Amino acid sequence: GLIKPGTLWCGMGNNAETYDQLGPFADVDSCK
């Protein structure tokens, strides 16, 4: 998938299995 640099979550598909893995950039990683 297309993951934004420095994130695990945002993009088409994701590398994080749970919201617990979002870390300090949760808002960005969850594409809010």
Swiss-Prot record:
Major subcellular site: secreted
Reactions that this protein is recorded to catalyse: a 1,2-diacyl-sn-glycero-3-phosphocholine + H2O = a 1-acyl-sn-glycero-3-phosphocholine + a fatty acid + H(+)
Reported cofactor(s): Ca(2+)
EC category name: hydrolase
Cofactor note: Binds 1 Ca(2+) ion per subunit.
GO molecular function terms listed in the Swiss-Prot or TrEMBL record: phospholipase A2 activity; toxin activity
Gene3D superfamilies: Phospholipase A2 domain (1.20.90.10)
CC per GO annotation: extracellular region; nematocyst
EC numbers: 3.1.1.4
Biological role: PLA2 catalyzes the calcium-dependent hydrolysis of the 2-acyl groups in 3-sn-phosphoglycerides.
Family, as annotated: Belongs to the phospholipase A2 family. Group III subfamily.
Protein name: Toxic phospholipase A2
Species: Rhopilema nomadica
Biological classification of the source: Eukaryota, Metazoa, Cnidaria, Scyphozoa, Rhizostomeae
